[in-house]
């Protein structure tokens, strides 16, 4: 596996990998890799001739009081995991490489980026859209793979790709991969490392409460009362606050006030200990 830090070197390496019409699948990450990331890598390998991964902790998607400095960084360990999975190339740019002096461009995707995490973390998805667009332009992949755990991020990236007429990758080749969970139901996340043993045990209550809410909504219960009960259950499990618990259209992320059978997603963000955990699950046919 090649590990590359300079854009000129990346372009040459990508050209070499694409030689002879070979295809590339891209898995962008912020490092602190876990089984969820490796699942993306394996799906990428199934879809293309070569897999390219990136590790870049993007400062533009962190707010002023968020965990940029504390976010786990373990490049050597992560690189070894990617190499063991057969990744051909690791793109690991510096902040100065991605945002040199004088950098002045920002991508903002209205609508889908303004609710849920977008409302709780202003500017977050501008940072996500900007860095992902840059990474797409740098790597020029045929496919890009993202975890469905951050459903809103996936929706923002697809909207951006569609609106900007991106072809590498085309929006239809931006692939969402189902959330990987522990046996307890807790969604895998790099931020789970912040949890103590007690907090991790309490955090399992999130997915259980979400499943109960989904069963109620699909069974005909009122959406508003089901979400209110979900919030109460999350707090009772040991979470200190709930940023949001929303039912939204799976494609547009518009609020669903009355569930009528169209594909929807239950999206939740809640805080426990020093961690802000997000999760989502499908409601109705997917």
Curated annotation (Swiss-Prot):
It catalyses: (R)-pantoate + beta-alanine + ATP = (R)-pantothenate + AMP + diphosphate + H(+). It is found in: Cytoplasm. It comes from the Bacteria. Gene3D superfamilies: HUPs, Pantoate-beta-alanine ligase, C-terminal domain. ATP binds at residues 30-37, 147-150, 180, 188-191. Its EC number is 6.3.2.1. One of its GO terms (cellular component) is cytosol. Pathway: Cofactor biosynthesis; (R)-pantothenate biosynthesis; (R)-pantothenate from (R)-pantoate and beta-alanine: step 1/1. NCBIfam families: cyt_tran_rel (TIGR00125), panC (TIGR00018). Homodimer. This is Pantothenate synthetase. It comes from Novosphingobium aromaticivorans (strain ATCC 700278 / DSM 12444 / CCUG 56034 / CIP 105152 / NBRC 16084 / F199).
């Amino acid at each position: 596996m090649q590990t590359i830090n300079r854009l000129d070197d990346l372009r040459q390496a990508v050209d070499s990998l694409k030689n002879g019409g070979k295809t590339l699948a891209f898995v962008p990450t912020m490092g602190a890799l876990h089984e969820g990331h490796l699942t993306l890598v394996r799906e990428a390998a199934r879809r293309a001739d070569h897999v390219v991964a990136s590790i870049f902790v993007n400062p533009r998607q962190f707010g002023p009081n968020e965990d940029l400095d504390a976010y786990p960084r373990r490049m050597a360990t992560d690189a070894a995991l990617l190499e063991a999975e057969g990744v051909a190339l690791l793109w690991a740019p510096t902040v100065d490489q991605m945002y040199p002096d004088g950098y002045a461009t920002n991508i903002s995707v209205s609508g889908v980026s303004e609710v849920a995490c977008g409302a709780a973390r202003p500017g977050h998805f501008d940072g996500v859209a900007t860095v992902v667009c840059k990474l797409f332009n740098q790597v020029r992949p045929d496919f890009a793979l993202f975890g469905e755990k951050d459903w809103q991020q996936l929706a923002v990236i697809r909207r951006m790709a569609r609106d900007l007429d991106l072809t590498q990758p085309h929006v239809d080749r931006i692939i969402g991969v189902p959330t990987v969970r522990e046996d307890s139901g807790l969604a895998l996340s790099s931020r789970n490392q912040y949890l103590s043993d007690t907090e991790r045990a309490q955090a399992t209550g999130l997915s259980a409460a979400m499943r109960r809410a989904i069963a109620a909504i699909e069974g005909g219960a009122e959406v508003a009362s089901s979400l209110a009960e979900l919030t109460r259950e999350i707090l009772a499990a040991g979470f200190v606050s709930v940023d949001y618990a929303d039912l939204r259209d799976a494609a547009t992320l518009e609020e669903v006030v009355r569930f009528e059978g169209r594909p929807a997603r239950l999206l939740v963000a809640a805080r426990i200990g020093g961690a802000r955990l997000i999760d989502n699950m499908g409601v109705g046919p997917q």
